[in-house]
């Protein structure tokens, strides 16, 4: 009875049949100022309809091996409230009782004479959550300050790079159009598929100019080119042209340039 204080809410649980000792203990509890006592049989506790965290002290003459009942008594106890068990049926003694109470959620378990065991409910409700402070704020501030540069700091130890020193005189020379060409810069001169630097047009003009020059400078090696295709070689530059007089300048009319229908 030393566990009960004034104005406590007490749940007294008895097992078996009511005896004179039980009535005497209940009367002693009621004599404490402000104490309210609820008396319940062990088999009826689960059906009693008591509220969660209702009692400051629970006095239970029950077996701690009944895990369902012990867990229910934990719910009925207020945070930091106590439950006092009198267990005469524990086969393994104090260690077994201690293990049963710990597995049910009680802490700070102590034993007393007469197979009496005192257990305490943790200072929080079952299912409650609490925010953990892992000290991340201080570490974040330190990390953020590592790369921070003070623009007003004129300390002599600070070394800065002059951007002008990163460029050589060759880098400052304006490039020419030839140096910017992409196609035709490796091996044989060949324009890209989507040439935009002018090389395609240049090569096309060169090829046409070469063909014209070849035609203008063409000379007969057989001496019979002017006679017509029947007397011309397969590689004759005048192949396909009409016969002409030796030394005559060849000009094709518009009608000759049109294909026959």
From Swiss-Prot:
Q: Is Transferase set as a keyword in this record?
A: no
Region Fe-S binding site B, as annotated, extends over 222-236
Find motif (Cx2C motif 1) and give its ranges.
Answer: 222-225
Annotated region N-terminal SAM-like domain: the residues are: 4-134
Quote any Pfam family the record assigns: Anamorsin_N
Q: Which residues bind [4Fe-4S] cluster?
A: 222, 225, 233, 236
Subcellular location per UniProt equals: Cytoplasm; Mitochondrion intermembrane space
Name the UniProt key words of this record, in alphabetical order: 2Fe-2S, 4Fe-4S, Cytoplasm, Iron, Iron-sulfur, Metal-binding, Mitochondrion
Biological process annotations from GO: iron-sulfur cluster assembly
Q: For the region Fe-S binding site A, what residue ranges are annotated?
A: 183-197
- Cofactor(s) needed: [2Fe-2S] cluster; [4Fe-4S] cluster
User: Which residues does [2Fe-2S] cluster bind?
Assistant: 183, 192, 195, 197
- List cellular component terms (GO): mitochondrial intermembrane space
Domain commentary: The C-terminal domain binds 2 Fe-S clusters but is otherwise mostly in an intrinsically disordered conformation.
- HAMAP family of this UniProt entry? Anamorsin
Family to which this protein belongs: Belongs to the anamorsin family.
Tell me, what does this protein do in biology? Component of the cytosolic iron-sulfur (Fe-S) protein assembly (CIA) machinery. Required for the maturation of extramitochondrial Fe-S proteins. Part of an electron transfer chain functioning in an early step of cytosolic Fe-S biogenesis, facilitating the de novo assembly of a [4Fe-4S] cluster on the cytosolic Fe-S scaffold complex. Electrons are transferred from NADPH via a FAD- and FMN-containing diflavin oxidoreductase.
Q: How does it assemble?
A: Monomer.
Q: What is this protein called?
A: Anamorsin homolog
Source organism of this protein record: Culex quinquefasciatus (Southern house mosquito)
